């Protein structure tokens, strides 16, 4: 029995994440495996278990399997997988599952992303904290002495070929013009999935010449952190795109569920532009099959170009709060064909409403390879506005800072709404800003967008000065 691990430190709102040996160890993971089965009622059912390339993922996978089989589940070990491979397997096999990963966090971290059968997300609102509480009890008091059901079995299965074939069935790249692409896997799971899906590792080759960067699976991340959201981590990819004269670059995060795109000039294409591009393609595809006004989900931080493109294409845009669980819930409720976030998470109805960066990347490749323009010109069409990006301010009184900003715009021709934080938008549509408090850190997050840089930049500077209680410099 252990009293050293406090699971409240590692169980977050949407997943589990902590430092190995401090807030997660094999004993704790075994207890989590047992609690996962008990809380979700999975005795006698199949549970899928996989992990990324982190040093502790294999050990944790085995520990989770011990706990799950002890409580009567039949475990299928998937080995090393990306997060979207788990979602695929959970949807395809209609089985609950987990993947051990800490995504883009540093090497000393690991964590767990969990799904119910059908790739349905598990969050604090749908059982994650119940699993935590029972696992803590098992950790403190020991697992029940005698299981009330026969122990389950353990088998092994590789889903990489099935996953690759399924993605290729959704986007046909066989007839595109030849493209040279640089892919930075960041020593993460993209080093396994890219050769399988886009290369010829398990299926016939495509008209793609792949220049690999950091495909070796290494959970110590020897080259750079596997977090493409940070511009510093894109520098090697940008340099390689220019060096090799590539048509585009792709950067995956550690568990390969997010993908960032670089054009032939070495410049990033925003996730909002990707969302708009993919949305237009998905709307056209399902309209051709007879679906009227297909729904596309986007969070309120994506560019206002997204709902404009969706509407123009004959779709119905639906805005939601920021966050994995909100998008997935809205995808299911609305029967949406596609959803996108500013953080480069892309959700597809045909992928069990789950997110997959690889499928989004395939849409970009299909769009680029289906015409002759370079990506910079193709992408510019979907990026008509100027965005500030997300800017964090460390503020103790987040509500007070927000109130000061609202007061600043009082009497001006603006609209204010409070779906997720506070959004202030010009009545003439020329700019908008959003202030959103972090739930876990003392940060107030600022996002903004304008018709031009000349419009949005002074507003950005004034708002940040008010938030930080400074005076803007002339």
Regions found by a protein language model. Give the residues of each.
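N-terminal small/polar loop signature for handling phosphorylated ligands or for N-terminal nucleophile
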Residues: 43-110, 196-262
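Gly/Ser/Thr-rich active-site loops/lids in small-molecule metabolic enzymes
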Residues: 202-207, 212-214, 267-286, 357-366
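Short glycine-rich phosphate-binding loop at a beta-alpha junction
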Residues: 44-52, 180-183, 294-300, 337
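Proline/glycine-rich low-complexity loops and linkers
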Residues: 78, 129-165, 264-342, 346-347
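Glycine-rich phosphate-binding loop
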Residues: 95-109, 114, 240-263, 267-268, ...
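Gly/Ser/Thr-enriched, mixed-charge loops and adjacent short helices
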Residues: 110-242
